[in-house]
């Protein structure tokens, strides 16, 4: 059985990879990292990160679900929820 913290770690790592790729700079991502404030991600960059993550995890992230996402942990949880429903 796969532990949930392992899945979350994978999601957080992939969020960091996507953010680094989109932003063109190294990004350290923690569950508590606020996407806008701590990671300095604007709305356009966020959409590009979301597209990278959709490709990585082969999921579609509904825009209405993003409204409640503030931290990398929130985004990781959303990704994991969508992956388990796929």
Curated annotation (Swiss-Prot):
Superkingdom, natural source: Bacteria
SUPFAM superfamilies, A to Z: ACP-like (SSF47336)
Domain Carrier: 6-83
Cellular component terms per the entry's GO annotation: membrane
Gene3D superfamilies attached to this UniProt entry: ACP-like
Pfam families, sorted: PP-binding (PF00550)
Metabolic or biological pathway: Lipid metabolism; sphingolipid metabolism
Keywords: Lipid metabolism, Phosphopantetheine, Phosphoprotein
Gene inactivation effect: Deletion mutant cannot form bacterial ceramide. Mutants are impaired in growth at elevated temperatures but are resistant towards the antibiotic polymyxin B.
Modification O-(pantetheine 4'-phosphoryl)serine occurs at: 43
Any one Gene Ontology BP term: sphingolipid metabolic process
Family stated for the protein in its record: Belongs to the acyl carrier protein (ACP) family.
Function: Involved in de novo bacterial ceramide synthesis.
Protein name as it appears in the record: Probable acyl carrier protein CCNA_01221
Organism: Caulobacter vibrioides (strain NA1000 / CB15N)
């Amino acid at each position: 059985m796969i532990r949930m913290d392992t899945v979350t770690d994978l999601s957080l790592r992939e969020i960091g990879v996507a953010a680094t790729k989109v932003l063109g700079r190294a990004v350290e991502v923690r569950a508590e990292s606020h996407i806008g404030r701590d990671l300095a991600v604007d709305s356009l960059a966020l959409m590009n990160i979301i597209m990278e993550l959709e490709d990585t995890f082969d999921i579609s992230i509904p825009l209405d679900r993003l409204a409640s996402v503030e931290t990398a942990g929130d985004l990781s949880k959303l990704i994991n929820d969508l992956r388990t429903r796929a």
